[in-house]
Amino acid sequence: MYRFTKDPAYLNLARNIAKFLLNHPNLPADKVPYWDFNAPDIPNAKRDVSAASIMASALLELSLYTSGKESKNYVSTSADILQVLSGPAYRAKPGTNGGFILEHSVGHLPGNSEIDVPLTYADYYFIEALQRYKKWAL
């Protein structure tokens, strides 16, 4: 919203959301979130690469509207997430996974739907984040 309105309240909200996510005690070291930060079975809870992809892309955009150490931290964290998602734990081997790039997303675990599967929007935000990183951070 800040990009379109330039209302500082939206920028402040985005910064607070980023702070909440990045400092959450249940965010794993590789920064690929569990399907729910309060899942009762952490650390054995399913991971959600769609959430990680969205977070990487959003942090890159947020880096454009912040400066100094804060901006660099958002870029660096996004780079770390993209590196992890590009690795063997989360990226599908070519010719597998129905043509999707990423594995291990969770859509709606309580509804027993889309659990540990590829999701279109995970790949979408992963590609968006890669493009943003290439354009804005390299």
Q: Which residues does each predicted region cover?
A:
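Glycan-recognition and catalytic cores of secretory/periplasmic carbohydrate-active enzymes
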Residues: 1-138
